[in-house]
Regions:
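Phosphate/pyrophosphate-binding catalytic cores of soluble transferases and nucleic-acid-acting enzymes
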Residues: 1-320
């Protein structure tokens, strides 16, 4: 039997502090990082995505960061395809891939090698649902989803029309709930020898970090970044512009919301998103939870992660 290849996953809600830990980990074991963030993949969208800066990378190779134009669609199928290609390159160099990011759906698809091609989307039904969303609003589709699959509705925001439509399509096509399908996929055996870490803070601390992060984004020029994208012709119907910290500003630029209200909305939406992320990770199996408050220093946290990786036989210790 072929030996399973090593894979490390470092995830957690937005603003948990994954970036710093991921760099320390990569430098310790000779790892290379693949981003599992559905937004950091886009060019020109740096502030609102809290994209890692080149100087923060500290020489560690990164994949799926700053690779797509905002006009392009990035989805789970493209992610898995690109991530697997990057992993082959990393393995060939004798290094270990580290998946870092908060898009749990992408991580699950890669970790358990889920094939999405078996459920071909029905073009006509999708267009029908898209039309419904235009005529009656996103909330209308979301209410249908809540009736059909309330469990899945808990972890997807009504603004994420693409995922709402996918769940409705899946139900129409198979007669089953997408939440049940996801549970079945989680029971699959992963083709990798993996360690799955979820870094988190207690809720009050996390929410405070989110609020402060949004304030810092505004100081760093988030408003100007969004304005520049709109002036370049990027419209609100694009997948990229539906991201947190971007979609909220369209109402502001249309004169329907004050700047203060917009910033509050970004904070609120981000807090809700973090809550949904944690709900997703709780449903995953073989997860190691890392509560930041239990570690006095970053080094203690890194040492704990390295010990677990060693115990799992993923690597023998530090390489750098």
């Amino acid at each position: 039997m072929e030996q399973k290849k090593p894979l490390i996953i470092l995830t957690g809600p937005t603003a948990a502090g994954k970036t710093k830990l991921s760099i320390g980990l990569a430098k310790s074991i000779g790892g290379e990082i693949i981003s599992a963030d559905s937004m950091q993949v886009y060019k020109k969208m740096d502030i609102g995505t809290a994209k890692i800066r080149p100087e923060e990378m500290d020489g560690v190779p990164h994949y799926l960061v700053d690779e797509f134009d905002p006009s392009e669609e990035f989805n789970v199928v493209v992610f898995v395809e690109r991530a697997k290609a990057a992993m082959e390159k990393i393995y060939a160099a004798g290094h270990i891939p580290i998946i870092v990011g908060g898009t749990g759906f992408y991580i699950q698809a890669l970790l358990y090698d889920i094939d999405f091609s078996e459920h071909e989307e029905k073009e006509s039904y999708r267009k029908e649902l898209e039309q419904l969303a235009k005529e009656k609003g996103k909330e209308y589709l979301y209410e249908i989803l809540k009736e059909i699959d309330p469990e899945y509705a808990q972890i997807v925001h009504f603004n994420n029309v693409k995922r709402v439509i996918r769940a409705l399509e899946y139900h129409k096509e198979t007669g089953h709930k997408l939440s049940e399908h996801n549970k079945e996929q989680r029971q699959k055996d992963s083709p990798y020898n993996f360690a799955y870490f979820v870094l988190y803070h207690d809720r009050e601390v996390l929410y405070d970090r989110i609020n402060r992060r949004v304030d810092l984004m505004m100081e760093d020029g988030l408003l100007e970044e969004v304005k520049g994208l709109i002036e370049e012709g990027y419209t609100k119907d694009l997948v990229s512009m539906q991201g947190l910290g971007y979609k909220e500003f369209f109402d502001y630029f249309d004169g329907e919301m004050s700047l203060e209200e917009t910033v509050d909305k970004v904070k609120r939406d981000t807090r809700r998103f973090a809550k949904r992320q944690l709900t997703w990770f709780r449903r995953e199996k073989e997860v190691v939870w890392l509560n930041k408050k239990e570690y006095e220093q970053e080094k203690n946290l890194l040492d704990s992660v390295l010990n677990i990786i060693k115990e799992k036989g993923i690597c023998n210790g530090t390489k750098r």
